[in-house]
Amino acid sequence: FTFENEPTTVELTKSDLTTGEELPGAHLKVTDEAGNTVDEWTSTKEAHAINELVVGKKYKLTETKPADGFVTAESIEFTIENTAEIQKHEMKDDVTKVQISKTDITGDQEIPGAKLTILDENDQVVESWTSSDKPHYVEKLPIGKYTLREEQAPKGFILTNDVTFEVADTGEIQTVSMKDDTAKGKVIINKTDADTEKPLKGVEYELRDSKGKVLDRKSVV
């Protein structure tokens, strides 16, 4: 009689945590108990198969670089069982999450109407939008450095400087804040005699806003 041992087969899946679909573009490797690399590859839309791993031995699946817009997953350890069945293991990647606030100088109130743009390290536009009364939420920004730029300030506010920020390798919500100061003007009021055009003394005046609220009251002596 001749006995033939069937080779073991391991199927490794790299998936999107939010959709469950296969995630292409991640760099992965499998190492043995001694830390030697057994196989390495870049994920595609299909599961990756490895044959003839040793029964009873432990292996580790490690993500060396996540796909763009995703976070590096924790390594997975698995042991090869004595079976001809396909042994399946799945590694899931979460997405990056960034929340951007456009507020007044106090940081307490969101300001609608600002035209904002996110630029990458190559000054390429990643996303543009107009601010509202709620923070702007962005998912799947690749890990790295970015610039938040105000292209146009809301009415009554001053255009502010760029804000640089870095998207870290984490699935937690990362917050970015840009603050606008109010526009401040100066009003010069001259009260003159209609005939002589000389300044008049003893004049009182009030400065009111559009709703009639008194902003200032002065007397000319």
Task: Give the label of every model feature segment.
Residues 1-221:
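Solvent-exposed loop/turn and edge beta-strand elements of beta-rich ligand-binding domains
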